[in-house]
Curated annotation (Swiss-Prot):
GO BP term (any one): proton motive force-driven plasma membrane ATP synthesis
Keyword Transcription regulation: no
Organism per entry: Mycobacterium marinum (strain ATCC BAA-535 / M)
Record Pfam families: ATP-synt_A (PF00119)
Identification of the protein by name: ATP synthase subunit a
């Protein structure tokens, strides 16, 4: 089996690169991310037009309203505090963006490269560490900016380090630094592992390869949804912790 894997020359984590303005970029990740962003923007404008119209709300609008209301209720009851009005739409947008960028890889869009190998055109963006780290750092910067806006430029760092027990300040600092790392690696690890399994399935004989590949692709849709949901849920939790005041508790 080991010899077969080596002979197949499986390249997991490899990306097609190009140089733009002196910078090396992963073009497959950029393509998947750009398509996902366009879909999210189109969906946002569509929902906006439905909200401002006088017609009866459509199924898509009712679906997202139900998700938003249900998520708000569950999160607030779980963490015991109210969340800022802008946090939930941001988290839902991140959820949809991650979900679409990962689900694009399920589409049977392939091409033959210069070496004669068949390659997927749309790869899961979260299999690129640069993508997930950029998302995690974006969330990290945003919730700290929100915390400074709510608590003050002095009050936020003090509350952040002190927490509920001042003696735990060093541990709180390490925990805060680890948040973007754990947030990104959790998403990256699960999607990257899926890419490895797809590469191993490619070693099956052609006449039976479709069966395990179809089963895994179906499961991959579920994994992508769960990981996008966890990322969005942790985003809400981090914002709530950063903006927490004593009077916010129920």
């Amino acid at each position: 089996m080991t010899e077969s894997i080596l002979a197949a020359q499986i390249e997991v984590g490899e990306h097609h690169t190009a140089t733009w303005l002196g910078m090396t970029v992963n073009t497959d990740t950029v393509l998947s991310t750009a398509i996902a962003a366009l879909i999210v923007l189109a969906l946002a404008f569509y929902l906006r037009s439905k909200v401002t119209s006088t017609a009866v709300p459509g199924g898509v609008q009712l679906f997202f309203e139900a998700i938003t209301i249900q998520m708000r209720g569950q999160v607030e009851s779980a963490i015991g505090m109210r969340i800022a009005p802008f946090v939930l739409p941001l988290a839902v947008t991140i959820f949809v963006f991650i979900l679409i960028s990962n689900w694009l890889s399920v589409l049977p869009v392939q091409y033959t490269d210069e070496h004669g190998q068949t390659t997927e055109l749309l790869k899961p963006a979260a299999a690129d560490i640069n993508y997930v780290l950029a998302l995690a750092l974006f969330v990290f910067v945003c919730y700290h900016a929100a915390g400074i806006w709510r608590r003050g430029i002095v009050g936020h760092p003090i509350k952040l380090l002190k927490g509920h027990v001042a003696i735990l300040a060093p541990i709180n600092l390490v925990e805060e630094i680890a948040k973007p790392i754990s947030l990104s690696l959790r998403l990256f690890g699960n999607i990257f592992a899926g890419g490895i399994l797809v590469a191993l399935i490619a070693l099956f004989p052609p006449y039976i390869m479709w069966a395990p590949n179809a089963i895994w692709k179906s499961f991959d849709l579920f994994v992508g949804a769960i990981q996008a949901f966890i990322f969005a849920l942790l985003t809400i939790l981090y914002f709530s912790q950063a903006m927490e005041l004593e009077e916010d508790h129920h």
